[in-house]
């Protein structure tokens, strides 16, 4: 077995994964066409016509089937039965009798179904309490408050659905339910619901057209969507296709509907009629659930029914490089050569220990690959096809007869194979996969991509569970993921992970996902964002897009933007048909990679914790604003900003040449992850977004566990240094509790509480490991740990250095506690009086005024002539300068210098930039008596005009510049006196005496005035 090389689909096809090459689908299509044709007699149920592609998919996989036949709506209610746990309506439709069962499942909401039910069943149903009114209405109520009111109307009926607050959400009448019959059996079902004005509908699986689906029609039939083409070829496309179609719809009217069917179907959400939406499925199952809570509550109930997300191994949340097999085989001359070249490249960037690499096309039997990857602790992820030819399968299952192999058969000819697809419902499939990967899982194989899960033809027969392709076409990803998940659990050393392109309801319990195939550039990136959020709203929690897009080569700028975006996805993974190695994307590619590689490593514990929480609650890691804030109508359809891991407000920059970007801030206080900027929410604000910066803000009251290096700085290298457990915290608007799952059984609780207007406390529960705290959004005037006051430090602390707190501006305070035994930290908030020294500066070129006017939208382009001149800023007076910020738009100078002077003649160079890549360059000047600042020796690239939008300078943030309230000042004064530190307290003593004198004088004046008023009042009475 060790020398057997795998083959799948075709021997050559195994190296060509993506549809840009179209070889694999073509071969499969030929196989499907050559399969035994279906013959249907009058005694069999209707068979879909695979050639009737009324949707015009043009996809290289089985076309959308079509079953002809008209619908019969319910024309008569015959009887009702009020049973203990179900309300039964016997109805007539087109001369056929059916029963509709209304129940209240223990997963919440209500369910309406016929005798033909879908795959998912609740553990039980609640007891129904019936309330009858004088006019004959029957009210039924669930434990979660969902209420259904039945009233008979002549020979018909009406069901009114209300939420727990008694608000009517929608109604169902006989004309909204349709069945199509053949030979007395149901062959198609339909449900119509009203569509209100300004109603927003979202979910429906992973989408690429838009986040809000009102006005659109959607195909509920998994296909290879073919959206990995340039935008120009998609501009007029309806884009209704999807790899992961899930019939779950959220309405902003306050409910969620899930149609429990895997059969082929479609939804028409105001496409044909703006007053209604229609769900149609080509199978006998009429079965849907409705939940009436908030969108997140409803999604949790849906997960309770279909399954919560799986927990990935922690290493899977680190950056995972990958690319197309053609790149792996050519970039370094061979697969092994490219792996060695990759390892050298990451070593040079200071990140040698890559957790895992997706090596598409790698031979999993090649010991040389494992030996090479073992040196850097890198796990091997590979491409895993949905099919194997007979000879390959027999090699994995020695002794098994050909007819007994777990291969899908023809539903009309049990001995005829259909496409060599693995029948993953057959127990032998697990044995086969175990024999394929088991030995290699013990030496470094850890999963990879599950691809082409959309190719199951209708005629396929799955003998393992007796289903056919009609139902299994959409359900196939569930079974593939399940088998691989079980095999990896049993064979891998420290867990495995698979990423499926196809998806369906329930698959989230067994596999993670990648967002299909997109083209590079801004348009493809926007589709990735829509796909991730719509998929998350449909229960597909663990996802990661192809960093940089699949087809094409992104610009250096868009590679950087994609790197930033990927760092705030559940899974950070790269893939593409050209190199996705950061060193191939210029200085900006390398620098952005290094920054966000380490920032991601800082956040791995937090993301892993969120994954565990999701597995317990069913809530996704990425949440669109309309799910998080469902009562804000402005968020309907908005996808550009989202919540990540409950605490981060993320706005990926998906426009080229942007240095400013609009961020939508929900109500409440938000604090910049990078700069500590405080923003009061409730509006959309334009913020700085230089090329290496993604706008990420932290929710008020957050307590976020992070792992950081000795420097106690985020995004700093942690290579070959001791790491430290820390917390990122923000000031709470109100009391807030945060849970940190260290593993699936261990949870630490942090509570943030306001003590008063200028003080807040963080309480840590059992299991706390944090020995440092990073406060975002404020300087601090004082910090106490379990009642003991910490000293203020005047230089950046390190993890093993002196305990204390340090702040140099109003954006951040670093607190080094020194141990993890603490229970409470109390932080008194302070504020430095820092002003931009450039505000009153003069310039040697009138045009330069735009760089110091405080308006980030005014710019200064350095022309050919001006690049030869010095850009000189004269401060209002000579002063100490701590930092200088040079801010470039997306068009920047790669080489330039910055110098300072006290007299304009003698200059000291404080920056010699040789590898500039734009963005905000922060220069630590740390100089006294600065009167002039000069930018000079600007080198322009051919055809590029560098553009500045602002230049700023700030003085030192000395102790005298930080202030708190009067009580804090007195507390600090007493502390210094008691500890004999009077030298540092002279200023405070003088200030405090002055304040006390003023206060006493004010009190005396008030008392005397009161006495005078009382005396006058007494005289008047006399």
Task: Please place each PLM-identified region on the residue numbering.
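Sec-dependent signal peptide cleavage junction
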Residues: 34-45, 1008-1011
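Trp- and acidic/polar-enriched beta-sheet ligand-binding modules for extracellular glycan
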Residues: 865-869, 890-957
């Amino acid at each position: 077995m060790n020398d057997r090389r795998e083959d799948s689909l075709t021997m050559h096809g195994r190296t060509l994964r993506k549809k840009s090459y179209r070889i694999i689908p073509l071969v499969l299509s030929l196989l499907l066409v050559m399969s035994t044709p279906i013959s249907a007699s009058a005694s069999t149920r209707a068979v879909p016509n695979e050639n009737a592609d009324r949707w015009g998919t043009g996809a290289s996989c089985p076309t959308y089937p079509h079953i002809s036949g008209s619908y019969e709506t319910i024309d008569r209610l015959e009887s009702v039965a009020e049973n203990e746990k179900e309300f039964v309506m016997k109805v007539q439709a087109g001369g056929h009798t059916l029963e509709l069962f209304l129940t209240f499942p223990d997963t919440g909401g209500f369910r309406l179904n016929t005798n033909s039910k879908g795959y998912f069943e609740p553990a039980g149903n609640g007891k129904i309490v019936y309330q009858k009114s004088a006019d004959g209405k029957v009210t039924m109520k669930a434990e979660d408050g969902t209420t259904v009111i039945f009233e008979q109307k002549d020979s018909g009926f009406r069901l009114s659905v209300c939420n727990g607050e008694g608000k009517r959400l929608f109604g169902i009448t006989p004309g909204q339910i349709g069945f199509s019959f053949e030979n007395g059996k149901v062959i198609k079902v339909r449900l119509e619901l009203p569509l209100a004005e300004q109603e927003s509908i979202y979910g429906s699986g992973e989408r690429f057209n838009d986040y809000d689906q009102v006005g659109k029609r959607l195909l509920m039939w998994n296909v290879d969507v073919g959206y990995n083409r340039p935008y120009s070829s998609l501009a007029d496309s309806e884009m209704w296709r999807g790899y992961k179609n899930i019939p779950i719809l959220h309405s902003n009217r306050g409910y969620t509907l899930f149609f429990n069917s895997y059969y082929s179907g479609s939804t028409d959400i105001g496409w044909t009629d703006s007053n209604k939406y229609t769900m149609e499925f080509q199978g006998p199952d009429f079965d849907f659930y409705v939940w009436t809570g908030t969108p997140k509550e409803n999604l949790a109930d849906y997960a309770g029914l279909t399954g919560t997300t799986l927990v990935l191994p922690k290493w899977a949340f680190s950056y995972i490089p990958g690319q197309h097999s053609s790149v792996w085989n050519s970039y370094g001359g061979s697969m092994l050569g490219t792996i060695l070249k990759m390892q050298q490249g990451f070593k040079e960037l200071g990140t040698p220990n890559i957790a895992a690499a997706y090596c598409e096309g790698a031979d999993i039997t090649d010991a040389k690959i494992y030996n090479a990857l073992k040196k850097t602790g890198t796990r091997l992820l590979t491409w895993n096809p949905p099919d194997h030819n007979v000879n390959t399968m027999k090699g994995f299952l020695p002794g098994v007869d050909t007819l007994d192999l777990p291969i899908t058969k023809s539903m009309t000819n049990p001995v005829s194979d259909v496409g060599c697809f693995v029948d993953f419902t057959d127990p032998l499939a697990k044995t086969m996969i175990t024999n394929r990967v088991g030995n290699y899982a013990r030496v470094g194989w850890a999963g990879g991509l599950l691809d082409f899960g959309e190719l199951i033809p209708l005629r396929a027969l799955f003998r393992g569970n007796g289903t056919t392709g009609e139902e299994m076409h959409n359900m196939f990803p569930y079974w593939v993921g399940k088998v691989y998940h079980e095999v990896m659990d049993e064979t891998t050393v420290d867990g495995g992970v698979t990423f499926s392109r196809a998806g369906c309801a329930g698959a989230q319990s067994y596999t993670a996902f990648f967002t299909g195939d997109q083209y590079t550039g801004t348009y493809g990136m926007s589709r990735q964002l829509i796909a991730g959020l719509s998929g998350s709203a449909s229960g597909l929690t663990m996802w990661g897009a192809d960093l940089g897009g699949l087809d094409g080569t992104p610009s250096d700028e868009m590679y950087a933007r994609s790197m930033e975006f990927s760092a705030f996805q559940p899974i950070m993974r790269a893939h593409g048909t050209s190199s996705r190695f950061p060193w191939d994307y210029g200085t900006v590619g390398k620098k952005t990679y290094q920054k966000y590689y380490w920032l991601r490593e800082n956040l791995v514990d937090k993301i892993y914790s969120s994954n565990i929480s999701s597995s317990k609650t069913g809530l996704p890691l990425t949440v669109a604003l309309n799910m998080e804030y469902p009562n804000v109508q402005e968020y309907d359809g908005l996808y550009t900003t989202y919540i990540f891991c409950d605490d981060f407000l993320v706005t990926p920059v998906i426009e080229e040449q942007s240095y400013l970007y609009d961020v939508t801030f929900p109500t409440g206080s938000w604090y910049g992850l990078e700069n500590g900027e405080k923003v009061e929410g409730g509006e959309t604000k334009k913020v700085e977004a230089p090329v290496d910066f993604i706008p990420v803000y932290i929710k008020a009251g957050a307590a976020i566990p992070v792992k950081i290096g000795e420097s106690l700085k985020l995004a700093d290298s942690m290579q070959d240094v001791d790491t430290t457990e820390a917390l990122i915290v923000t000031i709470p608007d109100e009391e807030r509790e945060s849970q940190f799952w260290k593993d699936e059984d261990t949870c630490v609780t942090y509570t943030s509480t306001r003590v008063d207007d200028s003080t807040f406390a963080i309480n840590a529960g059992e299991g706390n490991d944090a020995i440092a705290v990073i406060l975002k959004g404020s300087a601090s005037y004082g910090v106490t740990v379990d009642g003991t006051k910490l000293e203020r430090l005047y230089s950046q602390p390190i993890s093993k250095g002196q305990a204390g707190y340090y702040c140099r501006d109003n954006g951040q305070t670093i607190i080094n506690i020194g141990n993890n035994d603490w229970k409470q930290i109390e932080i008194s908030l302070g504020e430095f009086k820092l002003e931009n020294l450039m505000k009153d500066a003069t310039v040697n070129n009138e045009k330069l005024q735009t760089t110091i006017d405080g308006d980030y939208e005014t710019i200064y382009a350095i022309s050919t002539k001006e690049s030869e001149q010095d850009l000189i800023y004269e401060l209002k007076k000579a002063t100490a300068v701590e930092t200088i910020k040079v801010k470039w738009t997306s068009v920047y100078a790669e080489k330039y210098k910055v110098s300072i002077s006290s007299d304009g003649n003698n200059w000291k160079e404080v920056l010699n930039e040789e590898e500039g890549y734009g963005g905000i360059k922060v220069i630590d000047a740390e100089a006294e008596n600065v009167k002039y600042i000069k930018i000079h020796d600007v080198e322009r690239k051919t055809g590029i005009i560098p553009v500045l939008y602002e230049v700023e300078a700030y003085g030192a943030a000395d102790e005298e510049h930080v202030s708190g309230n009067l009580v804090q000042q007195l507390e600090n004064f007493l502390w210094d006196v008691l500890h004999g530190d009077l030298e540092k307290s002279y200023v405070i003593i003088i200030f405090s005496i002055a304040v006390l004198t003023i206060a006493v004088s004010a009190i005396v004046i008030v008392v005397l005035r009161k006495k005078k008023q009382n005396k006058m009042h007494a005289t008047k009475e006399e």
